Amino acid sequence: MVVVGGVNTNYRHYALVIVLFFFLNVYLLYSAQNSVQIRKDEGETREKFQTPKVPLVDPISTCEIVDELAKSAISRATSPGCKSKLQLEACQLKNGTFSESFPQSTCSNHQDALIDQRIGCFLDKKDARVLKEFEYKFPQSNSKSTCRKNCYKAGFLYYGLEFGLECFCGNDVANATEIDSGECRNYKCPGAEDEFCGGFNAVEIFRTDKLVMLKPKYLPPAENVSKPPIKILFLLQLNGRNERQVKRFLKSIYLPNHYYYIHVDKRQNYMYSEMAKIAEKVPNIHITSTRYSTIWGGASLLQMFQQVIRDSMEIEMFKDWDYIFNFSESDFPILPIQDFERLITEHQGKSFLASHGYNTGKFIQKQGFEFVFSECDQRMFRIGKREFPENLRIDGGSDWVGIHRDLAEYSISNEELPQKLRKTFESILLPLESFYHTLAFNSKFCDDLMMSNLRLTNWLRKQGCRCASLKQIVDWCGCSPLVFREDTKIKFEMQKAISKPTYFARKFDSMVDIEAIESAEQQSMSTSKIQMDHPTYHFAYANIFKFGIDEEKIAHRSLASFALNTIKSHEKMAKIVQIDALRAHHNAQIEIVMKVETQSGANFEFLIHRKSHVNLSTSGALEVDGYVLKDVVYGTKFEWKEEICREYMGFVTEKDTLHTRLEWSPTERVKKNDKTSPEIEFQYRNGPEKIDKSIVKPYDSVFGGQFDSWDVGKRLSNLSTCPDFFVDVFSPSSSESPLATLRFSVYTEQNVDCHVAYLRDFFEIVDFCTSETACGEKIWSMSYPDPKSDIQVGWDEEARILR
């Protein structure tokens, strides 16, 4: 060992290295801090409307999950990221760190001095309630604080305590009979032992702190509006593949002085590609590339809406809008767009929100506000119950809104209330139905509301509240409106629309009933702009397949080859270019239009007709328990609400669920409030061999429908042969002969050799064309003009319409 000056040289080397590392760390820290500061300075101008950063989910559990809702949700999540997100949020909920505390309301309808102000003790009976609007029961937690909080959030003026556990809410005590105060001191509050919660048939009533219920009066527009014109941002939230109906809607609402902003669901690439073509032709139409999967009930819908607000303010040509109104692909105007424009101008500064139309307390329950939902794996999972803060007023109604610029800017700002509400509404079902209502009612904007969104919705809850279609995407049951048909379009007749007034209506679907759209169009547009005598005026189209966007299915390829062989063409198919469904009239059968490119580069277009293989009993025995069987249809992608199959080509594969629909007509022997169909037995067979059966109970349908669903893949295996499958429909009381029999085929990649025989039985090539010129003369062709929806040039100033 060498020692110099009493110091080991090895230690001197170590010390030198340590010193060098120290200065290196100091330099790196300085550089990082400087970089952060530079980025901060660059971002200051965008800070106000910047999209909030999404925090990373901690994958580590912080607690033991005991809530059954949370345990169920985590077990059903498919991705690790979703399971981790649900686990963390369930722990936050359990630990009390999930909810926010909110600032005091700045609405003029709120006064602190009224909080818990005692009104008195009143006689109360089950059949003669003082506070009639809503009732809660809190066996463990009832108290003044608990009751007030729940009545406050529903917007009521008064809350009342009774029988220990009962909490009542209402807005009127004018006709109440006051009794001795001692009658209201018979039961201790289970949630506060030093308080009393009323007596037997005795309710003690207090104020929440609301002054009056705000009900802005609707003012009809004057004929001449002296106020400066407004600019509206029309937000089109699009889904599906019926782009021709969207174009028709756009033509009906387009004015060059407004803005049109298009968001297409992230999963709908065909619609996106078609809308992008329009945006290229018309300068004040913009399609955003920032796309969300807007599932039913999901938080993503509100996030998308607010992202559009942020982004539109940064687009130079679009940034000066005054209002944002959102619409879907199934909306249509029922009064002239100029009248709508005039009314909005008359009420500048007001936002247009539709109320739920009934008791707020019931609305809160039906909307699932009391539960926490979490969106991941394209599903809304329910993970537990929530506690809302005492001072938050909740309200809601429709998610089709008209928001003034001031409220829109406030909603995306970093002020405390909107910032905390955005966070809270990430875990609320259908957030756009209540976010802006709640934000306005708890802020200075509560006086700037018109409680109407100027829309008419075709509600029929008996039919629209079918939960079957929602089971795959949400842990809840919700309602959707129905499509307008011949018997319901009277709802939007001119005088009814004016009296509300309502300027738009929904839902419309050209593949269900195009005549309803025609009625709305003729009512809202000048007839000089509508070519009612055009051959395709009654035609409805919906795209099924587009090359470069969709994956080709084996059954589609088989049909294309079959079509070429049927016309005795020697050409070989190279690719399917496009497939559309065509309905020539609202009562017509849906046909298939297929465009095929051959290996030589030639294009063929085919009109293809589907053959039905349904046999109804010829013995006349079609009546069961007073119901007469009228028709039997089958298909896949069944829509329970409208009772139609959205797989228009009629193919059934081993991956599908087969849906068989019976249509019944009641005789005079059926009582008025009975179901619309009898009990029926379905039997499934492979040739003569019975393979399954099911009993279907009586059903209640406004269309007289009754259904059975049969999972093909789970019931059948080894589908490499060419069997014929049958569904027999029997009356349970008579199984000797079926009421009806339908035949269907199952197309797989393993039984391709069977496809030609199947196609020969189930399809007919009705017509075809082989050139652009020839196809342009076929009214069924994709190339034939369709002026009601074509947008090929842009704005025609002279005709004042998109062409």
UniProtKB/Swiss-Prot annotation:
Q: Name one GO molecular function term.
A: metal ion binding
Pathway where it operates: Glycan metabolism; chondroitin sulfate biosynthesis; Glycan metabolism; heparan sulfate biosynthesis
Return the GO cellular component terms, semicolon-separated.
Answer: endoplasmic reticulum membrane; Golgi membrane
Topological domain, Cytoplasmic: which ranges? Answer: 3-13
* Keywords assigned by UniProt, alphabetized: Disulfide bond, Endoplasmic reticulum, Glycoprotein, Glycosyltransferase, Golgi apparatus, Membrane, Metal-binding, Signal-anchor, Transferase, Transmembrane, Transmembrane helix
Q: Which Enzyme Commission number(s) are listed? A: 2.4.2.26
Main function:
Catalyzes the first step in biosynthesis of glycosaminoglycan. Transfers D-xylose from UDP-D-xylose to specific serine residues of the core protein.
Q: What is this protein called?
A: Xylosyltransferase sqv-6
Originating species? Caenorhabditis briggsae
> What does the record give as the organism's lineage?
Eukaryota, Metazoa, Ecdysozoa, Nematoda, Chromadorea
Q: Which gene encodes it?
A: sqv-6
